Amino acid sequence: MKERKEKKETIGYLPDERPQFWKLLLYAIQQVIVMFPATVAVALITGFHISTTIFASGLATICFILITKREIPLYYGSSFSYVTAIGSLMASETLANNTLNEKIAVAQFGIIMSGFVSIIAGLIVKKFGRNAIEKVLPATITGPVAIIIGLTLAGNAITDACSLASAGAVLENQISLATNLAWVVSLVTLLSTIIFSVYLKGVWGQLPILFGPILGCMVALIIKLATGIDLFRVLPETASSGIFALPIFTLPKPSWLAVVAIMPIAIATIPESTAHIYQLDIYINDLAKKKKSTKKYNLADKLGLNLIGDGIGDMVSGFVGGPAGTNYGENISAMAITKVFSTSVLIVAAIIAMIISCFTPLINIIYSLPTAVIGGLEVFLFGAIAAQGMAIMIDKKVDMFSSKNIAVIATIMIIGVGGQYAFGGNIPFFGLDIPCVAGAAIFGILLNLVLSIGPKKRKQIEENTELSNEHENLNVLHN
């Protein structure tokens, strides 16, 4: 009995351990299933090619793991944080006459450049420590930026929830009914996703973004059979009818507009990536302790390397035509549940994702999802992004009674949200169209640096005064 109990405690795989082939394959498939819904959702929302997005996530993951010397088991997937910036850029008047591939090419350049933000942050952390980054990007900036990323997408979510865009068979006299039924589909998707996320446990609890849309599609199918109203999207003429086809690769096109729009958003992913590496450190060291491993897995000390890997992932994804991304918390949770942290598993998962991206029938099924289903999902996801921003400030115990903090948070929030709803996402400023989220982030960073000058001096004076008083007290006692 004692031997059996001891054996049970040692179940699991550390980053440098490799399961047997059949286990390796099963664990890898599980990781693909976990990352799939969110990665695909970003492609559907931004208009990027689904097949290319899936392929890019796999390729970027392999590059991330190799660059981090196979020490950090994280999966790279598309990030919702960039959706506003990419969407505003691709919908801008400057690119109005461009084809989809031309718009993606412009966005790619901004995505590649955003990778430099994470790389620079990583180098700073490696050289000066984590505190150096937190001085420039405190929670009073990263939190509100995450909030406005979510809130500026609220209009898109509600519009898509009742949209008939690219829908199939909808007659003119059925438009009113079809719109109402689209609301039903989006609400079913939203509520089922929420219920699944709250009540499902274990590995199943990591898949609400998969199960919610499936239920929404089932309702859309019932509506089609009962009323003849087809809410499923019509495939474009460019859709392949074969079994296998290579993803659509595009080359980046240099554009300063893309740099201004997308590059600053990388600051919002740094706290998330930081939290992930510390979370992973706890899980892996706990498993190592239970397995009585003599090796130390100090992942918390590899934050700089992790950020550099993230930046390289963005550059790789952007170069082939995929959206910007980050390492996925969903995959960390799946690893924590199964206690499988093997980097070999993630490499195989990445290869499987790249193979799946070439399977045309699956890609076509994903593309045909009703816009209402996507809209219902967006309500939950975009709200979650905003909530994450609040969580960042709560976790860092931001002083909401500080005049400086209130000033920084207030201006970021209003510039970001106001710019979206007053000017459609791009704020006109001296002949330039400044993307609202990027503009708010840059303004917040500069304002925080300016307002930090006075407090630093006051703090130094207070510290000097305290030291002087201590010396006087010591002299009095000595005498």
Locations of the language-model features?
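Flexible hinge motifs at transmembrane-helix junctions and intramembrane kinks/re-entrant loops
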Residues: 45-50, 177-181, 185, 192-279, ...
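Membrane-embedded helical hairpins/re-entrant loop segments and their flanking transmembrane helices
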Residues: 13-15, 19-22, 44-65, 268-343
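Hydrophobic core segments of alpha-helical transmembrane domains in multi-pass membrane transport
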Residues: 31, 39-40, 57-65, 87-89, ...
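Intrinsically disordered, low-complexity non-transmembrane regions of multi-pass membrane transporters
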Residues: 1-26, 167-174, 231-248, 282-305, ...
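Transmembrane helix boundary and interhelical junction motifs in multipass membrane proteins
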Residues: 37-39, 75-82, 322-331, 344-345
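Membrane-helix interface "capping/anchor" motifs
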Residues: 66-76, 132, 197-208, 338-343, ...
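Early transmembrane hairpin of solute transport permeases
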Residues: 22-186, 358-361, 368, 372, ...
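Transmembrane alpha-helical segments and their short flanking loops
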Residues: 2-22, 45-48, 83-101, 348-477
